[in-house]
Amino acid sequence: MCQTYRIAICDDLATDRNYLSSLCEIWGSHNSYHIQISEFTSAENFLFNYAEKKDFDILLLDIEMGAMDGVTMARKLRQDNHTVQIIFITGYADYISDGYEVDALHYLMKPLQEEKFFTVLDRAVTKLIKNEKVLNIISVSEMRFVCPSARLRLCRGKQQL
C-alpha cells in the first residue's frame, strides 16, 4: 500500500509554487509515495483553508508574501498544530533564527538544490512517522483491561468505555 502525504505549498510566486510542486511529485514518485499537493498564494489563504480542514503533513512556506509573512503564519499555525513539518523556502537569510521559534524542520535558501530538498523531505517523513508511533504508543498505553468477576471492561483513563 502506498503511503499518502499531504503537502501545502504557500508562496506568492506562481513559478516557485509550480517548481516546488513538480519537485514534490518527483520525490514522491522516487519513494513510491502518493502526494497530495495544495497550493496557496498567501498566508491568509492558507490559514482560511486550514481552519476548515487541518490535514497537512508538510508545509513548504515562503517568508516574504505580502500582508502576512511566513513566520507570522507559522506562529499562528503552531498555536494548535505541532506535528505539521514546516520547511521555510526563501531567498532571505535574515529570518533563519525566526524558524527556530516555530520549530521549523529546516530553512532552505532559493534557488533550491534538488538533492538537499529531497533530503529535507525525507527528514520530514521520518519525523512524521516517529510522531505517529509516539501517538500510537500513548493511545495504547492509556488503555487498560480490568477483569473483575470474569467481566471485561475497557477503560481509558478514568472513563469506562
Regions found by a protein language model. Give the residues of each.
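Conserved Asp/Asn-Gly motif in the active-site loop of CheY-like receiver
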Residues: 37-44
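Short, well-ordered amphipathic alpha-helices
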Residues: 18-27, 46-47, 74
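N-terminal glycine-/serine-/threonine-rich beta1-alpha1-beta2 phosphate-ribose binding loop
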Residues: 6, 15, 33-36, 55
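A generic structural motif
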Residues: 28-37, 83-84
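CheY-like receiver
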Residues: 48-130
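Conserved acidic segment of CheY-like receiver
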Residues: 4-24, 59
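Conserved binding/recognition cores within well-folded domains
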Residues: 119-161
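Conserved SAM-binding loop
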Residues: 9, 39, 88-89
